[in-house]
Amino acid sequence: MILLDSKLENLRRTIARHQSCAVAFSGGVDSTLVLKVAHELLAGKVIAVTALSESLPSGELEEAAELARIIGVEHVVIQTFETRDKDYLANAANRCYFCKTEMYARIGDFARDHGIGAILDGLNVDDLTDRRPGRAAAIERGVISPLVEANLTKAEVRELSREFGLPTWDKPALACLSSRIPHGTPITLESLSQVDRAERFLKTLGVGQVRVRHHGDTARIEVEPVDFSLLHEHRSDIQTNFKPLGFLRVEIDPDGYRCGVSLPAPLAMGSNTPVDIQVGSIIRSIPLPLLTRIDNAS
């Protein structure tokens, strides 16, 4: 606890160096903590800025707006246009660089127009162990990562958020919709809409952490293992709702949800002829790259 208190003080010192700031605000656990501390130190000189585009999952903008209201910070929404960038749409491994370049350019323009001195993000030290092309864009634009400067891990961010009474302390990790599409597969507005609508439906069933990975006419569902039985229980509803979206095959990844995974398309199973595949009564553990097939078995 003493170490965590020391890190919190480092976080405060990092933010207090600035007279005003714009927080790149997704409404996730990390940026919410940054916004909360910034508001305590720079009340009236902090603005939460959320980027809106087709890659933002449904409901996240509304959640971000409500969080900003709870904290007491002005919330601004800026439109970004990464989906018009051919480099972004190509969906190479460095896709995030082009997204973040666009986002920070727009936030930078806003900050300059409003006399805001600094742009803060919610990167934490655990994120530095991942391959993050977007980090280069942040550095190029002079974006400050106060959680990194305070050496705060994701777990510590959650603990501090809990102590502050923030509702995001246990919020599942966020990621843009494009992360559901394997690298090398071009991104389209249609594919983004497909995964967004599919995930939105699954959440109405009570599923917690969820990703619907897009593999053409195949949807690969990743949920926490505790939710496997819930998918089985609603197998007919899943089929009914996924088919109109263009998903003729539905598969459950037996390893469950994994953050930041971008796997190649699943191997074909059975006939190559597109068929309706319902959720079966058995979820079989099949080593990757094979995935659990959801079929008509009873």
Language-model segments: what does each one mean?
Residues 208-215, 253-254:
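C-terminal boundary motif of the adenylate-forming
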Residues 1-163, 204, 219, 237-247, ...:
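ATP-dependent adenylation/nucleotidyltransferase module used to activate substrates
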Residues 186-192, 224-229, 261-268:
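Short glycine/threonine-rich loop-to-helix capping motif typified by GTGT followed
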Residues 284-298:
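Long, low-complexity, intrinsically disordered segments
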Residues 148-154, 158-202, 206-211:
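Mid-to-C-terminal catalytic subdomains of enzymes
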Residues 214-216, 220-232:
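A short interface-forming secondary-structure element
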Residues 173-185, 218-222, 255-262:
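Flexible glycine/acidic-rich beta-alpha junction loops that bind and position SAM and/or redox cofactors
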